[in-house]
């Protein structure tokens, strides 16, 4: 629908189609990081391994969507600003920091000391999730004339009904995919934990 039904935007042209994947992926990564926050707090409070595995699953999937947001944002930025990255753009910079936090989270959970990664990863996941509101409000305190980041949805930029239909469909599809991937990654984590438990019992 994004490629076949929605017309080109008058100013940006075909590159505006990136917007549908960019915003939907941002919503997906924010939702996944919200799950990381809840699951990490749950693990630190209860030491329940299921909560830890859910945190890992949501963090890894959220990082994938976070990467998509960063890449599509840079594609749009190159068309709008004639440069891939602008350090003067606070939302882009804060989102890069968010991406780096969850890159660290993913590396830690996959290559760190298994005896320590659960606690350290949970703390890092909470820190990353709490950075999401900072990303969102990072441009709100700037005067309107100084805002480089587009606010298409918030400022009513989707006037054609086909834009709204495509936007709603893209958000639903990407959020559904995100939820499915988190569930599948969680199941893989559970099966891996059970396999390690059985292997440990056999060695005894």
Question: Model-found features: residue ranges?
Answer:
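Polytopic transmembrane helical bundles with strong interfacial aromatic enrichment
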Residues: 1-204
């Amino acid at each position: 629908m994004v490629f076949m039904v929605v017309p080109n935007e008058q100013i940006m042209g075909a590159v505006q189609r990136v917007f549908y994947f960019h915003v939907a992926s941002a919503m997906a990564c924010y939702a996944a990081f919200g799950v990381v926050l809840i699951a990490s707090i749950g693990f630190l409070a209860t030491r329940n391994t299921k909560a830890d595995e859910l945190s890992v699953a949501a963090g890894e999937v959220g990082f994938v969507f976070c990467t998509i947001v960063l890449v599509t944002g840079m594609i749009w930025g190159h068309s709008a600003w004639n440069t891939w990255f602008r350090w003067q753009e606070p939302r882009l910079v804060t989102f890069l920091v968010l991406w780096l936090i969850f890159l660290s989270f993913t590396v830690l959970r996959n290559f760190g000391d298994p005896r320590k990664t659960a606690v350290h990863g949970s703390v890092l996941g909470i820190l990353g999730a709490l950075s999401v509101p900072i990303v969102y409000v990072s441009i709100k305190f700037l005067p309107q004339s100084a805002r480089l980041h587009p606010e298409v949805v918030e400022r009513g930029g989707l006037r054609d009904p086909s834009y709204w239909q495509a936007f709603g469909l893209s958000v639903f599809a990407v959020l559904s995919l995100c939820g499915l991937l988190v569930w599948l990654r969680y199941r893989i984590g559970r099966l891996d934990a059970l396999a390690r438990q059985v292997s440990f019992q056999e060695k005894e």
